[in-house]
């Protein structure tokens, strides 16, 4: 049976200065969030045989391409900002890795973390598949030591021409709104998340700001992945983009009030945020 939601991207191992290794990656966190909203969730990824998919992705079908290693990330925080290192899996994910069932997913979320997802997925996707993209990993390159730097997103025109929705954080482009606006002009629907300030939706190039509820932040980890998964599902279900963005903003805001996997959406979050989003959309003049 085909999944309701398919995330395509490397799952990761995140290394910490105290020696801990924790699971990570947009495909990992977004799929766990999606599982709170839909029944059938799958992940297409590449990882070493030692990666414990049953433990890290319970209730999710994992189609794992064999890899000698699992992609690793290490973040080092300095007074001058964050320095990031990666040791990526050498396996690039291509459309040929899709099974017939995965090819027929209702939603395909392209979720690269280190330029490992081929942009050809958009060209080969069935026309009735909702394509959501979080291009963060297409914006990264690294040197021989693994230190991560920014790079141009050369495939942006190709990807955005087909994608039903794309989401970036303003931090992904180091605050460069000019670059974000360039991509927004090429997209059907483009969202820039702005942390506690909410997000800006570009619909056919026109901007709409959606505020986030005021909350007490405990842990922001994964909030962007939760936002993207929630948004893609809401849009695929037919919500007006403004209501869908308000819903996703609310769910992501609730997630930062809890730590680790406790940040995943609860039934109470989803019900409360659905009501809030409907009310906000009515006030904004876009009920559906």
Positions of predicted regions on the chain:
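Conserved phosphate-binding/catalytic region of the ribokinase-like
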Residues: 1, 180-288
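Short catalytic helix/loop segments, enriched in acidic residues and glycine
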Residues: 22-36
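Active-site regions of enzymes building and remodeling cell-envelope glycoconjugates
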Residues: 57-66, 127-131, 147, 186-192, ...
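Conserved N-terminal subdomain of the carbohydrate kinase-like
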Residues: 2-7, 13-21, 36-132, 272-288
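Conserved beta-alpha-beta core of the PfkB/ribokinase-like small-molecule kinase fold
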Residues: 107-181, 197
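Charged helix-capping and loop-helix junction motifs
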Residues: 23-26, 147-154, 180-184, 210-213
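Alpha-helix C-terminal capping segments
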Residues: 32-40, 234-237
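Short beta-strand scaffold segments in enzyme catalytic cores
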Residues: 32, 73-76, 198-202
């Amino acid at each position: 049976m085909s999944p309701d939601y398919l995330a395509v991207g490397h799952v990761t191992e995140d290394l910490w200065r105290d020696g801990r290794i924790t699971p990570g990656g947009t495909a990992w966190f977004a799929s766990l969030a999606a599982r709170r909203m839909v029944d059938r969730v799958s992940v297409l990824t590449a990882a070493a045989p030692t990666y414990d998919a049953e433990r890290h992705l319970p209730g999710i079908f994992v189609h794992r391409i064999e890899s000698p290693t699992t992609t690793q990330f290490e973040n080092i925080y300095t007074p001058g900002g964050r320095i990031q290192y990666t040791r990526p899996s050498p396996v690039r994910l291509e459309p040929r890795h899709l099974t017939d069932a995965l090819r027929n997913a209702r939603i395909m979320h392209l979720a690269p973390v280190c330029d490992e997802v081929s942009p050809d997925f958009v060209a080969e996707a069935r026309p009735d598949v909702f394509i959501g993209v979080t291009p963060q990993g297409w914006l990264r390159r690294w040197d021989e030591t693994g230190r991560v730097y920014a790079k141009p997103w050369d495939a942006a025109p190709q990807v955005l021409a087909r994608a039903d929705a794309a989401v970036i954080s303003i931090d992904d482009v180091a605050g460069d709104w000019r670059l974000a606006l360039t991509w927004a002009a090429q997209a059907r629907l483009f969202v820039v998340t702005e942390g506690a300030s909410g997000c800006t939706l570009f619909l056919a190039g026109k901007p709409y700001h959606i505020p986030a509820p005021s909350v007490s932040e405990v842990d922001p980890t994964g909030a962007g992945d939760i936002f993207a998964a929630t948004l893609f599902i809401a849009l695929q279900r037919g919500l007006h983009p403004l209501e869908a963005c308000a819903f996703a903003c609310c769910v992501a805001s609730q997630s930062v009030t809890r730590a680790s996997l406790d940040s995943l959406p609860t039934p109470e979050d989803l019900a409360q945020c659905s009501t809030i989003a409907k009310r906000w959309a009515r006030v904004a003049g876009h009920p559906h």
